Amino acid sequence: MPKLKPSFCSASEINTPCAPCPESPDDALHEACGVFGIWAPDADVARLTFFGLQALQHRGQESAGIAVSDGVALTCEKGLGLAREVFDDATIAALQGQAAVGHVRYSTSGKDPDISLQMAQPLVALDETGGFALAHNGTLTNTADLLEAMGGGQETSSPNGACATGAAVSDTQIATDFIAHFARETKHLESALERFIHTAQGAYSIVVLAPDALYALRDFSGIRPLCLGELPGKGGFAIASETCAFDLVGATYLRDIAPGELVRIDSAGIHSKKIANEHPHLCARPAQCLFEYVYFARPDSVIDSANVYRAREAMGRRLFHEAPVEADIVIGVPDSGIPAAIGYARESGVVYSEGLIKNRYVDRTFIEPTQELREQGIRIKLNPLHYAVRNRRIIVVDDSIVRGSTSKQLVQMLRNAGAAEVHLRITSPAIVWPCFLGINTDTQGQLIAATQSVEEICDYIGADSLAYLSLEGLKSCIYAEHPQYCTACFDGNYPMPKPNPLHADAFLPGYKPTWNND
């Protein structure tokens, strides 16, 4: 049986979990991860994966990892920090192979180096199929069902040992154990991946590297993005969370991985199996996360054939028609608010100006989850351009309001800089419901819009006016090929069955969500 090369990671370092993000310290929405995979026997796959991770760095800054296959064995390297901090030329040169997967992660669960390293991906499992490395973006909502399918709390065949230890583990750890367990049982990794797709619920965009193949799989709703590209002249293919990674490695975007699809790439080419078509009774409704377009994705990416920058600019234009106000300038909150601010300015005729300067040398992970530093965080990252805002009526365009504390500090900073009026315009509807699908808002009590009206929020943050883009307005701005979206955080209409387990404090009294299996 092919063996795992322990060149760079100890067994304890390789087989470690990556937990979903808990509450954010800087009052912003965050996802957990970005994933990349490549099959290109004639290329430097580790270096191309490193480039891909750099393009996806906005999706995670706490840790980075790369696993490669030489056709016989897997080798893995990962560590804390940005991709450029984890990998140098010597490290990359030592990762030789025909295929690779990579991962970048964001979390605020703590800064203990041992804990953070345990959460780094890819995870690597050994089994009778030769082993595999797994990188995951999303959150599984039925981990209890997955554990039960492996025999509850009993020992499993996976070397990760999630069930054997009985310790608290992440959904990614459980997914890795599940696949390893059934790969050993069936002697066939692809069968285990199919069983995972049949069983798992929630959001997952996953790349899996085996010694002789690269796999990509996406949940039935297609909540998190995952796309397929080709490397012209290199006889290879790439998988990535976003198309911006293809631009950096010289790949051509072919298409998105479809919801409920399992793709295998090997020496014979691309093979696709549409599990959604074979088992329609298992399928949840398609539901791409709207916040990928509003905030998460890079503006130069394309998701479901929709250009992200174009969508954000359209959100700003639509915002003007829904919530006009007299002002002297329009400014955007860097970075996602800038295209929308430009759209608002163009449609309204109000002058667009830079009004907030972003410190691009501050890592998100610098801010610790303490109240004192949380309040300091906005001043560390943004500074008003006094010349532009002094004595002027300002329209400020931002992507969202979560708890309201960042917006409150932002408005106060602009007033301190001399702004005569501050009118806040948000390119998404009010976030009222928790997310269980890969965003760090899993309890409703942390959302200001769940307990306060627009007028009350406006008063709290100290703005002269506040307006959100309507849900229909937001959807009309995206121009996607398959315009079916997850709107759960706005309207409580969840695309998946009720999570198992469900956080006891997920919902406030009086709120009744709608589940896909209701």
What residue spans do the PLM features occupy?
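Secondary-structure transition/capping motifs at alpha-helix termini
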Residues: 157, 185, 322-328, 346-353, ...
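A structural signal for isolated positions on well-ordered beta-strands in alpha/beta enzyme cores
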Residues: 65, 395, 423-425
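PRPP-dependent phosphoribosyltransferase catalytic core
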Residues: 197, 212-213, 230, 250-256, ...
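Flexible loop/turn segments at secondary-structure boundaries
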Residues: 45, 108-110, 142, 215, ...
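Extended, hydrophobic alpha-helical segments in both membrane/secreted and soluble proteins
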Residues: 330, 337-344, 348, 352, ...
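Short, glycine/charge-rich flexible loops or terminal/linker lids adjacent to PRPP-binding catalytic cores
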Residues: 349-395, 405, 432-440
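A conserved beta-strand->alpha-helix junction
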Residues: 168, 173-176, 352-363, 460-478
